[in-house]
Amino acid sequence: MPMRAWLDAALLTRPPRLLHALLPGCEWTGPCHALSGAPIIYLTFDDGPIPDETPWVLEQLALFEAKATFFCVGQNLERCPDIARAALAAGHRVGNHTHQHRSAWATGRASYLDDAAECQVIIGELDGVKPGGSDYQSPRSLFRPPYGRLTWSLLRDLRADYRVIMWSVLTRDYNPSLSPESCLRDTLATVRPGDVLVFHDSQKASARLRFVLPRVLTHLAGQGYQFSAL
């Protein structure tokens, strides 16, 4: 593998600790290990829900009794609320990925926060939690910024209402220039107990997602891992 490609895979697949220091208060790994002592992996899926891809993901997770967290775009939740409810009914969690998949580097602070709040209202309606209720937009609500992009001021504001979840392993399934085999290889070479893995339940990622996810589940389950929601 050429040096530039190797560095790209190393930096993107597992973010360097410098990023942890630059974004204090974000969660980059999972909160705990199983009481049984079995290692845990936290699977997360960004950008859904959408027809075909998200139901397929739910089917794959069910085969392994795996729980996961879906960071959903509000507009997609409006289009496919039944898919999100199916995820909740199966014991998965739904987190906030903004309403319009906004980049924090290209959106004003107030507009970005309003966009996140709009998505959270929809999530609350799915959960049966009403705005203004004791659990509405609580500190236990989950948020992941699209593209992993944040500013310090936005991070400060978001942490008042959310756990801001980043990741420790990025599968890069969204990248059409990568082969499914390379995504799988880099992911399995990097993963370790407590990691938060990012997949994308999107049309763009479909070919790589459908190759990588079942193989990751099979490989890690064979090593005794459990799969938990955040």
Stretch-by-stretch model annotation:
Residues R149-T190, G224-L230:
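His/Asp/Glu-enriched short active-site or ligand-binding loop at hydrolase and phosphoryl-transfer sites
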